[in-house]
């Protein structure tokens, strides 16, 4: 249903039948910030293109992609929770890291109209970490969540040189699968983690926990110490409860918005064919 947008009036609309489209698909979708940021980036690059949100449930995703792909003016697709693994199955080609992870967050058209996918969550997260003064190399890291974003971040932490990566996820099958594949890279120690953050230099929440006011903290935040770096992938609220506790304890932190800014840059470069 249409909602009142009086508090956010549109100043200028330059849309025509020539405008190219990129969808961002998720369930839920109301929390995403990509439509405005990606659309602005298209404009800044001199492109007549828009990023449009689509709320699609997992049960409907395959049919939606099938029909959406028939639209000749759709050039790209951004996948968010929970569709990053499912969207990989719709890619005819993909980057090596996407193949390793079995997940994508961005898709663009091949010359024959099929989809080529890549995953930038991990690369963007580690670049954002570094910009915040946190060098992963040689550190012990705990990541909570082995979903699409968590898997990508875990992979990039390993390739960035962490000494040990502990993975915690309530879905033990998913957790163990990721741990096994990462261990096969022979880049560092991979272990099974828990919600206890003690002993880790880097602690990252890569789950949706914290989006709702009554969510439990993904880790035992009372155990944070001021020498830890604590990060989160959540963009709404701006300061998730876990991050609030970490800051109160003197930890350096990074929010989902910090990650999103870098991931957005990488996605746009991919979508416009600059990478």
Segments (PLM) and residue ranges:
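Rossmann-like NAD(P)-binding element
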Residues: 195-216, 231
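Short acidic low-complexity segments
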Residues: 186-200, 222
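Conserved S-adenosyl-L-methionine
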Residues: 159-164, 249-252
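Phosphate/diphosphate ligand-binding glycine-rich loop within oxidoreductases
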Residues: 2, 15-132
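ADP-ribose/adenylate-binding Rossmann-like module
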Residues: 100-106, 209, 223-260
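Glycine-rich adenosine-cofactor-binding loop
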Residues: 26, 119, 129, 134, ...
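NAD(P)-binding Rossmann-fold cofactor-contacting core
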Residues: 162-184
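Short, conserved loop/helix-junction motifs that constitute active-site signature segments
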Residues: 15-16, 136-137, 161, 219-228
């Amino acid at each position: 249903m249409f909602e009142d947008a009086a508090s956010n009036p549109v100043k200028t609309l330059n849309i025509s039948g020539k405008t190219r489209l990129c969808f961002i698909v998720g369930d839920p979708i109301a929390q995403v910030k990509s439509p405005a940021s990606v659309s602005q980036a298209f404009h800044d690059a001199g492109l007549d293109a828009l990023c449009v949100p689509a709320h699609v449930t997992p049960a409907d995703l395959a049919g939606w992609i099938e029909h959406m792909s028939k639209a000749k003016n759709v050039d790209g697709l951004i996948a968010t929770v929970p569709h990053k693994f499912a969207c990989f199955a719709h890619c005819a080609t993909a980057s090596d890291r996407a193949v390793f992870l079995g997940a994508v967050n961005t898709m663009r058209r091949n010359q024959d109209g099929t989809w080529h996918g890549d995953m930038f969550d991990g690369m963007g997260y580690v670049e954002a970490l570094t910009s915040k003064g946190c060098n992963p190399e040689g550190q012990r890291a705990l990541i909570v969540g082995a979903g699409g974003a968590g898997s990508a971040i875990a992979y990039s932490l390993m390739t960035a040189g962490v000494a040990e990566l502990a993975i915690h996820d309530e879905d033990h099958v998913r957790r163990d699968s990721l741990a096994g594949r990462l261990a096969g890279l022979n880049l560092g120690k991979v272990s099974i983690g828990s919600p206890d953050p003690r002993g880790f230099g880097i602690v990252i929440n890569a789950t949706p926990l914290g989006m709702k006011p009554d969510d439990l903290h993904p880790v035992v935040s009372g155990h944070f110490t001021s020498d830890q770096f604590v990060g989160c992938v959540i963009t709404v609220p701006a300061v998730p409860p876990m991050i609030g506790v970490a800051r109160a304890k003197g930890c350096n932190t990074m929010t989902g918005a910090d990650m999103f800014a870098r991931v957005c840059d990488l996605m746009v470069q991919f979508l416009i064919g600059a990478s």
